Design a protein with these regions (language model features):
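Short hydrophobic/aromatic patch on the recognition helix
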Residues: 64, 217-218
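Generic protein-terminus/edge-of-domain signal
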Residues: 1-62
């Protein structure tokens, strides 16, 4: 991908309803008030600043910063500066699920971790890597390859694995814990959320799927948060 810091023309490339790639996007496809997002977003800030909140964490986006948002998070976006521009990818919940399906085991604690670890400042070396990475994805979206969806999924999976690897390293420094019955339930709970969060947001629905009470599931979720 060419350096677009001095270009302002908005470019949009799509892959059906699954994937949208925006170059030089100023206003992120988010509301100015906290709302539950249905898609995953990967945002790279080219220049300028803007305010973003994920759950209760507020952050001012800076130039050369990578923002990672996951489906189901409560997010708001506001106050972009006059010169704010981004490269933004919007990934459907279906495609996001397919990207994670190739990962051996995503701990549910990772999703809590990402509530406060969603922005990543990039150094000079990182910026070159990010431009190469974004360029590969853009090339695949624009191509006529028969398996371009699968190729994009693999590229997305690479990024999510890098994030999960960083999370695991940090977790190991804090605690070396074995899987327990509660953690196994938490894993299953988050798998169900990925499948059903659009149509079901009631704890009772997930408790019924797991054959436990709503009260016990709430306790399991609280324990998961305590580990993050």
């Amino acid at each position: 991908m060419q350096n677009n810091k001095n270009k302002e023309t908005l470019e949009i490339y799509v892959l059906g309803d699954d994937f949208k790639y925006y170059e030089n996007l100023k206003y992120l496809p988010l509301t100015s008030y906290p709302s539950n997002i249905q898609s995953a977003l990967i945002v790279y800030s080219l220049r300028g600043t803007a305010k973003i909140s994920v759950h209760e964490d507020v952050h001012w986006i800076q130039p050369d910063e990578l923002i990672i948002l996951l489906p189901g998070q409560f997010v708001s976006f506001s106050e972009p500066s006059e010169d704010f521009l981004t490269v933004t990818m919007v990934i459907s919940s279906s495609m996001f699920g397919d990207a994670l399906s190739g990962v051996p085991r995503f701990s549910p604690h990772f999703f809590f971790y990402m509530r406060s670890h969603y922005y990543y400042p990039q150094n000079e070396r990182d910026v070159l890597r990010i431009y190469n990475y974004l360029g590969m994805i853009k090339d695949k979206v624009m191509s006529t390859d028969a398996y371009r969806r699968e190729l994009i999924i693999h590229l997305l999976r690479y990024l999510y694995l890098e994030l999960f690897n960083a999370y695991e390293k940090e977790s190991m420094l804090v605690n070396t814990r074995k899987d327990t019955r509660k953690e196994e339930l938490a894993n299953k709970f988050f798998s169900l959320i990925m499948k059903h969060f659009k149509e079901n947001k009631d704890v009772a629905f997930y408790a019924d799927k797991l054959c436990i009470t709503s009260k016990y599931l709430t306790m399991v979720i609280k324990i998961g948060r305590a580990h993050v």
